[in-house]
Amino acid sequence: MKTLLLTLAVVTMVCMDLGYTTICYNHLSRTPETTEICPDSWYFCYKISLADGNDVRIKRGCTFTCPELRPTGKYVYCCRRDKCNQ
């Protein structure tokens, strides 16, 4: 009986984890904070800062893979926790 209960507990925990989705911020630099629930298997949040003269633009959202770093004045931050791209 104990084995059956332990098996059911493990199966329940595994099944609960399968449905997990990441929550990321998705607002731009000068807009109020908003979030989005990422699509299945999109586990990363990103934050891209782009310097344009005296102005800095920031874009946030969900992504399947982390954006590539390029030497173009961009700062890219990628993470895997809920709301980690603030």
From Swiss-Prot:
Antagonist of muscle and neuronal nicotinic acetylcholine receptors (nAChR) with highest affinity for neuronal alpha-7/CHRNA7 nAChRs. The lineage of its organism: Eukaryota, Metazoa, Chordata, Craniata, Vertebrata. Residues 1-21 form the signal peptide. InterPro entries: Snake_3FTx, Snake_toxin-like_sf, Snake_toxin_con_site, Toxin_cobra-type. This is Muscarinic toxin-like protein. It comes from the Eukaryota. Pfam families: Toxin_cobra-type. It comes from Bungarus multicinctus (Many-banded krait). GO terms for cellular component: extracellular region. The keyword Phosphoprotein does not apply. Belongs to the three-finger toxin family. Short-chain subfamily. Orphan group VIII (haditoxin) sub-subfamily. Homodimer; non-covalently linked. SUPFAM superfamilies: Snake toxin-like. Disulfide bonds join C24-C45, C38-C62, C66-C78, C79-C84. GO terms for molecular function: toxin activity. It is found in: Secreted. Keywords: Disulfide bond, G-protein coupled acetylcholine receptor impairing toxin, G-protein coupled receptor impairing toxin, Neurotoxin, Postsynaptic neurotoxin, Secreted, Signal, Toxin. Expressed by the venom gland.
